[in-house]
Amino acid sequence: MLRNGYYESIDINGGNNFIISKEIDMSFINKVHWHPFVEILVSVSDGNEVEINFTKYNMNLNDILIIYPGDLHAINRCSGTSLWVAQFSSEMLSIINEMSSQMPLLSQYPYLKYDPSCADCDRIVLILKEFFATRNSDAHLKEVHMYAMLLSFFEKVGQNCINLRNEALPGIENPKQNMTKKMADACLYISENYTSPVR
């Protein structure tokens, strides 16, 4: 529910820690708002558009967008069932000190574009799809299982953000870049210094 035109409040009914939906409330389309909780959007078809802090994201199948507390955002285009949404208190993440200290970094990279050739992208999407499926299951301790999946999701997202940050910083190489550079240096050294055949 929007209050004062911009603030969204949620009601955690029945003591559930997660609000899960496989459709968007169409009354929120093109309405800029913010809220004090985390929201994860999963695109289940192409052609969705979401804006966070005046940056537009065109979301296609399996793309993921994370909206953090205080982010001004709006869903500009979707069909209602083309986006899945999960909402939960940020305290579920910030209770873990390591996670709390990484929140500023995570909020710099809210968009996870799906790459079908990337195994980590597939893992992240599968975690979220199981997360959504578990909500409607009859499993015992399902919120415990959902919380475990949520932490696993954010562990992978956090590692992705660290990698993106390291790639953007000059002079910091990730292990793959470092190994590739060493191999290239070795090949160059061999080609320059060993011009006669080895016997």
Task: List each model region and its residues.
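Ligand-binding loop in jelly-roll beta-barrel domains
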Residues: 70-98
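Short, Lys/Arg-enriched, Trp-marked, Pro/Gly-tolerant hinge/linker segments that flank
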Residues: 112-120, 135-146, 155-192, 196-197
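DNA-contacting interfaces and partner/effector-binding or oligomerization modules
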Residues: 101-104, 130-134
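Amphipathic, well-ordered alpha-helical segments in soluble domains
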Residues: 39-42, 123-130, 149, 153-156
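Conserved metal-binding segment of the jelly-roll/cupin
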Residues: 59-72
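Glycine-centered loop/turn positions within well-structured domains
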Residues: 48, 73, 196
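Generic protein-terminus/edge-of-domain signal
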Residues: 1-60, 77, 98-112
